[in-house]
């Protein structure tokens, strides 16, 4: 963050023609005549103006011809004067920093989405009247209109919106990408467009594993401590027998991933596959203790109406008192079905989302009596401390959670 500051220039003594008018009892210092100045470098002249005695200021004729106090200030000395100047600079820098933050905040408010009040992370659309909507909210409004069998409208001015009438606002997208955003690891600010690269490859505080983690080292810490740890790591000195357990656990994880991907390949061969780009918004229960939960609007899939619901720490009474945080979600059938429906589903990052989530496929058979799946863990990547709490906190800090839901219907 650059701070522009201007140092106050030392003013030159006014010429005799620009001297201010004096009262009867005021005195002004004047220089001696040219002849007396040349004869003595340290002489001072005295004159009387309005009856007052005036003492001349000695000049440094061997140097720059400036008064000593002024010469000392120009040379960088001055003791108290320098301290005062430094304090003034710090005050100016602090004031400029505060103005910069306020300006960034005002610009953020002007460029935010009219629906979720968040800055755009992908494309930004506008209605015919110029009201802004991020891509996620824009598609959400269009989907709501389709479900209600109504024409979608702008939430601000109620003008009709559609893919043909709304247009992208590239200027807003460009401006939003330049706004400062805070790194979740080092808390420094970077332009939003370069934040992801910084967090993944440049940040010295980003969580990193030891390069010997495959043979059992469980260390995980900031990147700048990696070299020191690896120099002192004891795992390279262990025997093959000692690291066999870690290698077997690593092989088991590889087998599980291979099994999951094989399952996904089989699911992609199904006849009925559908995906929806959804947005979960926060709500509170009506209980005495209002618990937080997230829920999407209704969406259509396989000629049925569905909802996705999520909760934090399995609806723990006081989740704010826990350092470990998880998100679990369930798929709910909102319409009646006469035949059982065997559904495979999983959540993943969508085109309007910056959510970091691993792939985990779940299955539930929906019937007339079983319209809600169990709550399944939303697998978030490990952060600081080896858990997904940091990613969970980042998602909870947003106005909503955008994601894509893939669903596969098994024909029987």
From Swiss-Prot:
Single GO molecular function: zinc ion binding
GO annotations of cellular component type: nucleus
Domain of life: Eukaryota
Biased composition (Low complexity): 1-17, 29-48
Keyword tRNA processing: no
Zn finger region (TRAF-type): 171-227
Positions of RING-type zinc fingers: 113-158
Keyword Repressor: no
Region (Disordered): 1-85
Family: Belongs to the ZFTRAF1 family.
Protein name as it appears in the record: Zinc finger TRAF-type-containing protein 1 homolog
The organism of origin for this protein: Drosophila melanogaster
Source lineage: Eukaryota, Metazoa, Ecdysozoa, Arthropoda, Hexapoda
């Amino acid at each position: 963050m650059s701070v522009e500051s201007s140092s106050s220039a030392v003013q030159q003594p006014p010429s005799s023609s620009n001297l201010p008018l004096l009262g009867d009892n005021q005195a002004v210092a004047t220089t001696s005549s040219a002849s007396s100045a040349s004869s003595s470098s340290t002489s001072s002249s005295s004159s009387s103006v309005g009856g007052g005695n005036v003492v001349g200021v000695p000049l440094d004729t061997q140097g720059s011809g400036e008064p000593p106090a002024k010469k000392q200030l120009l040379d960088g000395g001055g003791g108290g004067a320098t301290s005062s100047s430094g304090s003034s600079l710090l005050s100016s820098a602090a004031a400029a920093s505060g103005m910069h933050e306020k300006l960034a905040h005002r610009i953020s408010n002007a460029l935010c989405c009219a629906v979720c009040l968040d800055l755009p992370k992908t494309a930004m659309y506008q209605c015919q009247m110029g009201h802004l909507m991020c891509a996620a909210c824009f598609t959400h409004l269009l989907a709501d209109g389709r479900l209600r069998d109504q024409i979608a409208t702008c939430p601000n001015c109620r003008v009709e919106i559609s893919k043909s009438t709304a247009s992208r606002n590239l200027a807003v997208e460009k401006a939003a990408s330049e706004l400062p955003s805070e790194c979740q690891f080092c808390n420094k600010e970077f332009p939003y467009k370069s934040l992801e690269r910084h967090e993944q490859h440049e940040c010295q505080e980003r969580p990193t594993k030891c390069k010997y983690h495959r043979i059992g080292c469980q260390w995980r810490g900031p990147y700048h401590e990696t070299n020191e740890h690896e120099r002192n790591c004891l795992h390279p000195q262990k025997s093959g027998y000692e690291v066999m357990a870690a290698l077997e656990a690593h092989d088991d994880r590889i087998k599980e991933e291979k099994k999951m991907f094989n399952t996904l390949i089989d699911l992609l061969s199904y006849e009925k596959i559908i995906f929806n780009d959804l947005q979960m918004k926060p709500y509170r229960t009506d209980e005495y203790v209002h618990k937080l939960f997230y829920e999407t609007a209704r969406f259509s899939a396989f000629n049925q109406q569905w909802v996705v619901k999520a909760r934090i720490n399995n609806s723990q009474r006081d989740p704010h008192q826990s350092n470990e945080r998880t998100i679990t979600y369930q798929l709910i059938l909102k319409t009646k079905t006469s035949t059982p429906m065997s559904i495979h589903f999983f959540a993943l990052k969508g085109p309007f989302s910056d959510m970091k989530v691993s792939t985990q496929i779940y299955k539930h058979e929906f019937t007339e009596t079983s319209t809600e799946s169990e709550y399944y863990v939303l697998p978030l990547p490990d952060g600081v401390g080896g858990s997904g709490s940091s990613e969970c906190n980042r998602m909870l800090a947003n106005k909503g959670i955008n994601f894509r839901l893939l669903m596969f219907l098994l024909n029987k």
